[in-house]
Amino acid sequence: MKKIFIFGIGSLTGSKLAVLAKTRYHVSGSYNLRDPQIPNISSIHLDITNIEKVKKLLTENQPDFIVNTCAINNVDYCEKNQDVAKKINADFVSDLSRICQSIDSKLIHLSSDSVFDGTKKTSYVEDDLTNPINYYGLTKLLGEKSVLKTPENVVIRVSILYGWLPKQISNLQSSSMKPSNFGKWFIEKLMLNEKVKIITDEHSTPIIADDFARVILHSVEKNLKGLYHAAPHTKITRYDFCQKLAQKLGLNQDLIIPVTSKELGRDVMTGLNKCLDSNKMAKTGFQFMTLEESFSLLKQQIDKK
């Protein structure tokens, strides 16, 4: 049985991937804030900035595939804490890529639409010109370049990611003080009967974490190489996404307050077009879930909480 090691196994994507892959692979991983405590999966607390410990762990473990879900993805935090952002999003990724090459492990690294400036009129394809407009996007681009120096490696970009972890503490935040994921934050606000301001002028291609985990496992099993986008075919504004999700879950849609990104007063520039084109991934045989299918799955998971 081949081995998969997941950096960030306690994350939304990492834990979903671990559960999905454990019947076909020997899965283990490291976590920072929380141990997912998944049955039959070993996980270890690890400071990934201690690269010698990382190297020792991987050399002893000898995984066939290494998946890196670790990132500081709070755009405002990255702008104000550039040293920390670069250390996690770029420097660690560069070191990890070199370690993977030395032990002959394939690296699958997760990236973001933020490597683009968000001004294109249509969805971004993999070979579109990158032009990050904030420090987070710059660090993610640096990480991508390090990984892709090795042709066998894979980088998978994603736009808006959402999902549900039933054992999660409702107000759990990441190490950069960002809510665990946008979808869960939004749902819990409405469940508490709190109003939320949602922007109307940002378009994206949201993907549920369960489907994103399927994409990652697909890239392992198909031995994909290079750069791919993971994005369902639905392009939607964040406001319309929230309206549809609230309707599906039977939550009060009147609590959703429409605002423009300018009215929201963001501290850091972000692009308004976050849509990714995933035809390249689709041509490998992967079929993305529809938005309706994703919402139905999410509702099932919430009902089980």
Language model segments and positions:
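Active-site "gating" loop of Rossmann-like NAD(P)-dependent oxidoreductase/epimerase domains
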Residues: 72-75, 80, 112-134, 164-166
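Conserved C-terminal active-site "lid" loop/helix of NAD(P)H-dependent oxidoreductases
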Residues: 237-243, 260-298, 302-304
